């Protein structure tokens, strides 16, 4: 560290530590930043010594600067640090990083001209090239020095470790400094195994080479003598030029830097590859259920910076996607904050919010009163009939449970003889001799388990075990027992438990019988007196002699008791002796199958150092871990495990006990992702009414499930010692740890598998499972129901899951998942709003959480005003004064919660009805019921998805939200009762350009009816004045103009400041509305303004739009039309010139007429128009929008579908009384469609076979129509090896892709229908247009191009996988020039013409082909002295 920290010294270091990281920030640069920068430079193969001089800093800046745009945050931080360091070296006074960057930019701009002039002078002087690969020999000739294996090795390492992440580009730039095209090709060949990436790179090089040839045409005529030919594109790429030609071009006068040109092409290709290999889209950034909001915002903006989009689009993404992709808890608060909230306000409002922990806090407070009451009642009901006798487990040594309930692991090995290496069925021992040492007897320590032991190794049979009982022995027995090493036999019941026993010194073979009361032996001579007795058995009564005080020894354990001697068919040791020696009948826990877990590819386990802990925390952790080790939950490990995760301890709430916490954040980052088994919590409104109900809780849920053996090493942690007195104690987990990301998913999956057999055997039992909470309901009588519950508990216990009695709820009301369940109704657990004189931010957050929870059954609850209080950057402890509106809202909510409200249970035989009511201020409430005044569920909706909206749009959004919620809870959509008249709805619906599906509904006359405040005409108004409006603004000066020209000669222009083009267009509409009569025609060339007004908003966040709405309401009739700009339309051209004067430059474009002509024929979308005719997107959109057939509706809104190349969706749609069968390739959007004679299975199967003969079809997804479920379709699927999947009934979203394509196809058919006589012709024309004349989506392709690209890529990927698997069958023996001894075998990674890339242990090397021998790996074989690597067959 000393060497690295010596970059600055004395006064320079003082100056360095005064510079701030950010303008106005508190943090300043420190010495540690220089140490970090040195390490980063080593990673990028740059010399850290360059930091010591200003010249070196400039060199680093020149290397890093080209990669800043695509680089990571670490790369940008490194660039900023070097810029500041340069200023310190040069003694340039800067206060923060931003000033330093400005200085660097200024210096670079000033020196640019000097550098160019110096370069020109250098060329004139014809000095020797100093480029590294081209050197001057002793004769003065320019010769090539081949790129070194060390450089190639470094490049291969970069690609293998970074996997084409953004850091690859600066590394390539640094390693290829001054290289010739031949050197660059050598570098590319060493990573040729990445075929997909290399193909992309090759395509980019070919495109750039073609562009070079186009820009540099060949000169006519022969080349003059002594003059070199000019390089073509293929010459620069090194394919048609020699090394000597490349050197001549690079060192000539004037020089043609073919190496640098080719390098630039490669970097362009690498940029494309980086984007492909790091496909992080802003749409994929979503907040996890437990992720803090601040972390989510950091990830969001990090990805946003990398997005290729304009600033306007990025602003829109911030306003819309940031809230949309937040988790439900944060989303509720963010939406209540409204559109105008800043990032700081959002982050303050969402402090400590989100995930189950937040819900738990809300529920815990709501339950506090109930829990306290119940605890008191339980204590009063306690039965204190006598002191309970404690039992002790002989498996782990702990008191309080017996061995069959023990969770500690069982010992491995044969269950009969105890030895490892074979199973019981292969055992040759005649009788059990499985002795365990260190019994858990009284006054003895529990046996220790080996670290690798786990429950997964436990036997699955019943077994008989012998242990020391509680009954006291005689003095002789006790004395003798104390001197004997006690052992522990374990006998399985696969065979009869026969053992050899010693009775008064005589050996006999006897059966251990736990069902027999007495010990009965065949004829044996025993000393002492006896008395006659008659005993009953299965075969009748027999006469026996009864001997008292007989000494018996069984498996080394002694007992004294009564023995009966008589004609018994087999010697029996009964319970009178077995209880003395502590024999028990055990039911070992069945093994739970472990789920295999891996780290993310290319990652290693966490190596985070343990931070120091206080003495009391170390003592607490030591005690906790000792207990956990005894129970088998964790195991001790040695120094061979290199991984580490920090642990700490906190005190439990309202307790003196400590709780162990493990900081698994680093491991969670490195662990593979898991699919959430359960996407939400079950809701009581979806429960069916049941006669009998029970609620169970699984104790120590995670610790009952074993962790994958191969993954355990990564959970290692250390308990340090005080003052480092001794090395820390190291442990690893054997079971699922708390806080690890995989625990919830694995536990849910394991629990589901375990419950599956019980569910199959007891279909009458309904089990709702969420984590460790179980709701069990049935229509059985209470006695039968409770018997089944005990069966379920026993079933769970067999797998190691205990269900504690204290959490077993048998009588209503049942407390479950935060709800209170009664036999015929349900409610949320008691919600009490606190009474406070002053409210902090944290108090209001908790209050909003409680109210949101209560709103699912209490109607009309509002939180908007309370959420407004959370705006602004405030700390959690800041006191917030309540506004009058918030106080009123809180008082109303208190009144609503005063009377308890209950919901009822679902009846499948009755219809669902959803009624929505408007509350005003953009807030809505809804009630879902089956009978009036008996609500199943209530809720509220207060979203404002766009800046300008109206009540009808909000109502539509609320309907869609309730539909989705209903499908999740009940599996069907309710009938809706909406506060809007049919006429109002139809008027808006037919005009609204982006209409979406909503279900069946009827009008309900409730207060706050929804209505349209104004209506736009569909045709021009005869006799009304026509206003041609326009607006323009200058982006730099923010100055603008808005105005109009009328058909009657009126005109007006106003000047505006601090405005934009969009604002001026809206201002022009406002001017026209202000100055016009009650009826007016308005013509605009702005799609933006037209889109806002045509949606008929009645409220907006924009003050200007609200003013426009007020003017529209005053008018009797308004007609608003759009015309394309700059097309010579009279009034539009006049007003354009009027407002453009001195503000903007008008751009006239060629190709518009051809684009319009093609659009009129094919009705292609705007992306295809822009691509085919090289037009800007805004012009292409205007052409499409001006088409009367394409202006009916907007384009479909695209979602995200996870799909593979072989999946197709099929559906039938109807048009003109005929059936059209449509097939859509999900991944590409490619369509195949035909008009079929009838909707039958036969026609469908024939269509499916035609589809399979043209395209690779692996899976088809259809609805449950009779033609798709027919035997003919099943037969076709069987023959063509196609898997058929079905959608969800009543759920249109399950067939979303094909449903969307049906609408799209019908729209295109409508556009071309007048060009065809028959429908079947129009269908094929529409399919052609969709597949080949509409571009967009992934890659900007048409659907036809995209499907071919996807299939070709799939084939290439499969071939690549085959090659990789084939090449891994070979091993390489190699040597280098310095050491003639052969080394190996190493793993073959890639084989080229002149060299091979190998992996020896963890090191990747490039070895010349002549120094390597490649040998097929035939597995492990015994090699003799004459078996030498060089004699084997080479590849």
From Swiss-Prot:
Record region (Interaction with host AP3D1): 12-19
Residues the record marks as site: Essential for RT p66/p51 heterodimerization: 988, 1001
DNA-binding region: 1370-1417
Region Dimerization/Multimerization of capsid protein p24, annotated ranges: 277-363
Location of the RNase H type-1 domain: 1021-1144
Motif range (Nuclear export signal): 16-22
GO annotations of cellular component type: host cell; host cell nucleus; host cell plasma membrane; host multivesicular body; membrane; viral nucleocapsid; virion membrane
GO biological process, one term: symbiont-mediated suppression of host gene expression
Domain Integrase catalytic: from-to ranges: 1201-1351
Domain Peptidase A2: 508-577
Region (Dimerization of protease): 489-493, 537-543, 576-588
Any GO molecular function: lipid binding
Residue list for modification Phosphotyrosine: 132
UniProt binding sites for Mg(2+) 3: 1211, 1263, 1299
Misc note: HIV-1 lineages are divided in three main groups, M (for Major), O (for Outlier), and N (for New, or Non-M, Non-O). The vast majority of strains found worldwide belong to the group M. Group O seems to be endemic to and largely confined to Cameroon and neighboring countries in West Central Africa, where these viruses represent a small minority of HIV-1 strains. The group N is represented by a limited number of isolates from Cameroonian persons. The group M is further subdivided in 9 clades or subtypes (A to D, F to H, J and K).
Name of the protein: Gag-Pol polyprotein
Organism: Human immunodeficiency virus type 1 group M subtype H (isolate 90CF056) (HIV-1)
Lineage: Viruses, Riboviria, Pararnavirae, Artverviricota, Revtraviricetes
